[in-house]
Amino acid sequence: VYTENGSQNLGRCGGITMAHEIDYQVYGEEMQFVEIQLDPGESVIAEAGAMMYMDDGIKMETIFGDGSERGGGGLGGKLLSAGKRLITGESLFMTVFTNQGQGKKQVSFAAPYPGKIIPIYLPQYAGKVICQKDAFLCAAKGVSVGIDFKRKLGVGFFGGEGFIMQKLEGDGWAFIHAGGTIHERVLAEGELLRVDTGCLVALTKGVKYDIEMVKGIKSVFFGGEGLFFATLRGPGRVWLQSLPFNRLADRILSQGGSSGRKEEGSLLGTIGNLIDGD
């Protein structure tokens, strides 16, 4: 369903068990947003602060966890769900948007930085996709947003971009965001791919992933590629991003903090020199 043009065809999710049925359309090129169309009584969950606009008749409610527990879940289940989000560094709370009006209503969610929104229909991937902890944007209510545990300590603590991964499970649509250009790769059985940890966005549950330390002291100290790779072994599908947010932020900070005062033709440096009288 994912395309490279400015918008997408309307997608439909047939909620088999738990997830609400939703329609959607993605707009834009490099600064995208997704518009969700809800029938009366349908809901969508989203990260706090992701909402762009919503029609009159949409009720917004902040909840513990993701609201995927059957029958609303008890206090223990809600605390467990919220605690899992806390481990990934996310907020304890999520926001639910429900159509309580008459007829179809729209609510939209915007990407936090330049890149692409990737719609994922979970039943196409055996009901489970693992993604970077900051990638999740929104999903049909009923989709569970949890964490993916790894037995090896190194994966959780030495992954650079954050290799405590989020786990999306259910039978509906989920939407994730990634920076720059998105590359989708299908790995054959046993095929191995080494990826910068920050460039990994998501993978299907058949893909085995781990952390591998960069070999060679010269590569470690002078390669500029970080100390670790993510190793991905098929079969399955992986989504990669060309511009991780931490890489973008580092470049902006380095240019604004140091090179702006150097005589390199920097606009910031020139303005600063004029103000200082240099």
Predicted regions and their residues:
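Short, Lys/Arg-enriched N-terminal segments with co-localized hydrophobic residues
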Residues: V1-T17
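Composition-driven recognition of glycine/serine/threonine/acidic- and proline-rich low-complexity segments
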Residues: G15-D278
